Amino acid sequence: MNSPLIRDYMPELDVVRGIAVLLVLFLHGMALPLQGELSTFGRVLYDLSQYGWVGVNLFFVLSGFLITGILLDSRHRPDYFRRFYIRRALRILPALYALLLILEITGLASSPFIAVSFLFLANFAGFLGITKGYGVLWSLAVEEHFYMLWPFIVRKCSLRKLLTLTIVIFLGSPFLRILLLVNPVPQHYASFYTWFNLDGLGLGALLAIWLRMPSFRRAQLARVALPAMLLGGVAFVMLAGHPWADVTLAKTACNLASAGFLSCTLLAGSSKWKAYVDWPIFKFFGFISYGLYLIHILAFHVASILLSHYLATPLTRNPLAAMLLHFCGGLVLATAIAYLSRRSLEERFLRIGYSSRRVELLRPSFV
């Protein structure tokens, strides 16, 4: 017998988180720390890693789904806003501000960048002329802008109006990216600005709203989940690599595939097939995904320095080994730090919420 799709704790979503964060690590970890000519296999591996950015889009879809669901399920509460924003602050700020402190002490990011990141404006650093940034914080800023505005909209609108609005968001964001191509504006704007990255969040929100519509039936999702994943995946493969498509429709195709994958995971995780989405290794990385996402660039930087200092000569002769050592070394270091962060820092603040009668927190299935 099937369980409800929406439950207080959905362990299969940790698998989705784990896959998403490992894709991002694959992108940054395969960057060559040393010079040299790659073998054919190494070149294929490196080229594949350049599409690890799809993990960010998967995170956006998952975040839109979870946050919208949390808001919908609590919007009748008198403490709706206070509960949500305190919970978000307890989840996000401690690890983020700890990272910003490390970046300031080590000088790995400029003080102006750290200042705008403190205010969740890292995705506008380029517009402000700020250099020497820390890559991953742009996406965190996009999500925070969503968190700041979306609760007010969810509170006021009916499910039907919200469904219409999310469709407009899903279609409108790629339309803005297409308009960008006809204007003499640097393409990185399309990668980082909030309004160019809303289709993933909107599609995740749409899924959360649809699953809560009175007329929704499980069979409806079962009919569209796999086709959406396959259609989005095929479209992404066809579009990816074309300069005009990478910043426009390829992202939308990726978001559609991500929403289909998320839907398939929800269906399997609440059915007799749940063993097929119960992958302990991905659940572990999902458990530490937030800290891992924050710290991994710093960890890969350390791995690159160590390789360049101690193994520069032999690894120059074998750049594939250099690339793999860079990835594995950074992954191990980032995983260790992220696990310590989760256990000793993040959960310390989460327990504040658990023990408070004013703020109720779900089990640790956070974005």
What are these regions (language model features)?
Residues 1-12, 22-50, 67-79, 105, ...:
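Alpha-helical transmembrane segments in multi-pass integral membrane proteins
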Residues 93, 148-149, 162-167, 252-253, ...:
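Hydrophobic alpha-helical transmembrane segments
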